[in-house]
Amino acid sequence: MLSIVLVRPQMAQNIGMVARVMLNFNISNLIIVNPKKNDFFDIANATSCEALTQLNLTVVQNNDINIALKEALQDIHNVFALTTRSRDLTKASFYINDMNEHIQETQNNAFLFGCERTGLTNNELSLANYIISINSNPNFPSLNLAQAVGVCSYEYSKLKYLQEVNKNTKFENTNNLDRTKSLAIATVKENQYFLDDLFTRLSEKGFFKDSTKKEKNQHNIKEIFQKASLTSK
């Protein structure tokens, strides 16, 4: 299952155009985190030709964007964050059309999009499992929000179709399933619970002696475990 997650969207019209293109590709779960205006629905729905009313819409609000985003993603297994800018992050990064080996229809997946003006912050990106980008003109790479959602939705629907074809036509050797396919991938909420507990235990043992490096060290540890694709068990 796929969810589209919009973080701090600025314009109701953009939300509406996103809803319309989602319905074009039969994607029904839209999560909006801290929209700029709470009264976006009527304008967005009109812009979407009433597609918004046909989606499963969730709006998450909190004065702390990190808390709001963690709540929005708590049941997601794989978070794919879209950005056009190079970042100083150690996460796996690839073009949207190369995501086939990283996404499974049996898991909860999400495409994460930042606000129209500034995109995703590094703190918001830290909750993602993967960084993805669209192979566009390097001299003019930024698509508008609905265009970006449209490209990602198309690639996902194409991948979903190909996976279905392969499932029906290709014999699968169940004796050789790898660990990440035979066990459920941990959700964002489960990962966060594990990391919070780990950091508490490390602090109690005096691991973070240099307080000036604590945040950086925690970030590096978090990146290591996110790359490991932890399972629920």
Name each region found by the language model.
Residues M1-K233:
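Post-transcriptional modification and biogenesis factors for structured RNAs
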